[in-house]
Swiss-Prot record:
It comes from Eremothecium gossypii (strain ATCC 10895 / CBS 109.51 / FGSC 9923 / NRRL Y-1056) (Yeast). Residues 24-36, 332-347 have a biased composition (Acidic residues). It comes from the Eukaryota. Belongs to the FYV8 family. This is Protein FYV8. Residues 1-11 have a biased composition (Basic residues). Involved in the resistance to unfolded protein response (UPR)-inducing agents. Residues 110-120, 564-574, 585-596 have a biased composition (Low complexity). The lineage of its organism: Eukaryota, Fungi, Dikarya, Ascomycota, Saccharomycotina.
């Protein structure tokens, strides 16, 4: 699966541009946020924009004006064909890199060195390229499609000064900025032999070997390790630019010993003479805030020329027991966004060369906003160098193209995390090492820079995520809330046990025996009038779905009306109550025992006093003396405005108002007394209405014919009667004559 993904990514731009453009230099060196934070860097990136595909329309005005540069603006495909046909060692001055020149470039580059240093640099370059091309074996005559990210070439070994061109486009017309002709000619001459040597190396299918200052072959973090992981097997040479580039990068280990002897030629007298000037130029770069590599594009080969001090290993990979230079991607949202988009950070870190005398300190990573690190990090003396292991095809499972999520495996000392880029143009998975939890001096020498992702573990983890919403364990349906006011609360035992189907798996046999049976109906008993406490009748009234009988309806006013809210009764109320009680008792004993609401007693002509009820509302006669006394009592009144505006003292006004409040509280309008007398009356309210109702003749006839009136003459009753009659006729006929006679009789009938 990783092989297919790599092939598809390597052929992206070829399919889009039909082979005329391989997608090199599509990613710019800096992101938008870094350019906004640094105006100097924003000015530099104007000339560093990626080279776009061009039609084969010939050279520009600038190239036609220059002699010997007519072939410089040929399309990329034509340049690759010429490089393939020229073979190794074929280098002509016509194919030189036209570097744009500007006033800012003249200030930044200290190219005032003598022609002696430039010529010595060219001689050393020619010698190095010839020896490398002779030692390399031909990998194929077919020009490969160069991948977007190339490994930086360390020119410290051959004494190359840190030249940083300002752009990639060969046809950039920036000659009018005011640079002197001597600086421009020396700059173009310095890249002449380098361009053709790289073109010859690319045409023969070889790659520039990388070597560390201390003799160990190490690759820059991120980009080269990813390229080695993508294609380390020689049998994929025909699958595109990825495999061919991987074979070139694997030649580093084979030629490490051969390149070691070239180190003696790099420290010549000519190179050491020009070293202080180059160091001064590098210091000027740091003062201007210009950090990062410059790329020279020549015939599809992307060469990264660093400063005078070119890095072999990024400082963030030099994780020791005392220093930790790895980025933490959980600091802020801005760091996360730049961690996904700015892949160029691996090349933007640098360390001092062994040629520099002051090797005790080095500049660490530049900050995410484009400013250098706050303080230099000291080097550890006992740990000279950390060699990064070359990852082979066995670790190809670490390249996961997961876009939505990523998985992390934690060890005792190292935690690795895979960050997936959000940029649609790169689609590459970058791996970074997060800060170690506990550093061990014995094991801090090796740093794991990739994540082995196992497919089975990922599937198990995804299955667990899918089942979390189903098997939560603690969730149970809310059955108690649906019962409402009709059901009682569940017993404590059943509540603790929960649902029968969701019991704990760790329950022992004894607990299962003590568990309450699941089919018990004790919790599902329907109660029409639940007993819930002190105000049980009020709770039953609030439940509108309960069917009440007459006694419950009659008891409701008695509960609502409290005796404490009733005003004090008149003094003669006790005598009236005793007289009424005696009359009620005599009438109830002489009655027939039937209620006044019974229709049968009314029809029979029996009229008796009803049974005594304390809460029936009766409108009988009341004692006129007491009522007249209550009604005739004057309502206390006081002119409050005149009292307040009067000349009396404040204390007198306050006493007058307090006495008025007491009079109002003591006054009674008699309404409560009327209600109390009506409830205590001995006469039934039904007798008052029945005296004029039952004398009508049609009412008596209706009660006499109650049975006939009770029958319902509806469609349902009519249908049922007809069906019953038909059933009697049909089945009686079939039982007498048999089935044959029934059918024959039906056929003879006429409609």
């Amino acid at each position: 699966m990783p092989d297919k993904v790599n092939r598809r990514k390597s052929q992206r731009w070829v399919s889009v541009s039909k082979g005329n453009y391989d997608g090199a230099d599509w990613d710019s060196d800096y992101s938008g946020e870094e350019l906004e934070s640094s105006p100097t860097r924003q000015h530099e990136t104007i000339c560093k924009l990626p080279e776009l595909p061009k039609l084969n329309l010939g050279g520009s005005t600038e190239e036609r004006g220059r002699p010997g540069s007519g072939d410089g603006l040929a399309p990329r495909g034509a340049a690759e064909e010429e490089a393939a046909s020229s073979g190794r060692g074929a280098a002509t001055p016509a194919h030189e890199v036209q570097t744009p020149r500007s006033g800012a470039a003249a200030q930044k580059f200290s190219l005032t060195s003598s022609s002696r240093s430039v010529s010595s640099m060219n001689k050393e370059l020619d010698t190095l390229m010839d020896e490398i091309s002779k030692e390399m074996t031909a990998g194929g005559s077919e020009p490969p499609l160069v991948e977007t990210r190339q490994s930086p070439v360390d020119f410290n070994r051959v004494g190359v000064p840190a030249l940083k061109p300002e752009g990639h486009l060969a046809d950039d017309s920036s000659d009018s900025d005011g640079e002197d002709a001597a600086g421009g000619s020396s700059l173009s001459q310095s890249f002449e032999h380098l361009n053709m040597s790289l073109k010859t190396d690319t045409a023969s299918g070889q790659a520039m070997p990388l070597s560390s200052p201390r003799g160990s072959s190490a690759l820059p973090a991120g980009r080269d390790s990813l390229a080695l992981k993508k294609g380390a097997s020689p049998d994929r040479a025909s699958e595109g630019s990825l495999s061919s580039r991987s074979e070139d990068l694997l030649a580093v280990d084979r030629t490490a010993g051969e390149n070691t002897r070239l180190k003696t030629t790099n420290s010549s007298d000519d190179d050491t003479d020009s070293l202080p000037e180059l160091i001064t130029s590098d210091a000027k770069f740091r003062a201007d805030g210009a950090s990062g590599p410059a790329r020279v594009v020549s015939s599809g080969v992307e060469t990264v020329i660093h400063r005078a001090i070119a890095p072999e290993v990024a400082p963030r990979l030099r994780i020791t027991s005392k220093t930790d230079l790895s980025y933490r991607y959980d600091t802020s949202s801005e760091d996360d966004s730049e961690a996904y988009s700015g892949i160029e950070d691996d090349y933007l870190s640098y360390q001092p060369s062994p040629n520099i005398s002051d090797a005790a300190t080095f500049h660490g990573h530049r900050s995410r906003t484009g400013s250098p690190a706050r303080a230099p990090h000291p080097l550890v003396e006992q740990e000279e160098h950390i060699e990064l292991p070359v990852i082979s095809d066995d670790d190809s499972t670490s390249k996961s193209s997961v876009r939505d999520n990523y998985y992390s495996e934690e060890s005792d000392n190292t935690t690795s995390q895979a960050l997936v880029t959000q940029d649609n143009s790169s689609h590459d998975t970058i791996h970074d090492t997060i800060r170690e939890r506990s550093f061990d001096k014995s094991t801090s020498g090796s740093v794991t820079h990739s994540i082995p992702v196992i497919k089975d573990d990922n599937e198990d983890w995804q299955n667990q995520l899918r089942q979390q919403s189903v098997h939560l364990g603690a969730w149970n349906p809310d059955t108690e809330g649906k019962r409402g006011a009709f059901l009682t609360q569940a017993s404590p035992m059943s509540t603790n046990k929960g649902m029968c189907g969701s019991q704990d798996e760790e329950t022992t046999g004894d607990d299962q025996q003590l568990a309450e049976p699941c089919n018990d109906d004790s919790d599902s008993v329907w109660e029409g009038f639940p007993s819930v406490g002190e105000y049980e009748d009020l709770q039953s009234v609030a439940d509108i779905k309960t069917i009440y009988d007459n006694q419950t309806l009659y008891n409701v006013p008695g509960i609502i009306t409290s005796s404490t809210s009733v005003p004090p009764l008149p003094s003669s109320m006790s005598e009236l109550t005793s007289r009424q009680d005696t009359s009620i008792l005599s009438e109830s004993t002489s009655g027939s025992g039937l209620d006044s609401d019974s229709l049968m007693r009314v029809v029979e002509g029996q009229r008796h006093a009803p049974k005594p009820s304390m809460f029936k509302e009766n409108f009988g006669q009341t004692p006129e003396v007491q009522v007249e006394h209550l009604v005739n009592s004057p309502v206390p009144s006081l002119d409050i405005c005149a009292l307040i505006e009067g000349p009396q003292s404040h204390s007198f006004k306050r006493d007058k108002l307090n006495s008025h409040i007491e009079d109002l509280n003591a006054y009674s309008s008699g309404a409560q007394t009327w209600i109390k007398y009506a409830l205590k009356s001995t006469q039934s309210s039904s007798n008052i209405t029945f005296d004029e109702y039952v004398i009508s003749k049609h009412v008596q006839d209706a009660y006499a014919q109650a049975e006939e009136v009770s029958k319902k003459h509806s469609v349902t009753n009519a249908v049922n009667q007809n069906v019953s009659q038909l059933r009697k006729k049909v089945f009686s006929h079939s039982m007498k004559e048999g089935a044959k006679g029934l059918l024959s009789s039906i056929g003879k009938k006429k409609l």
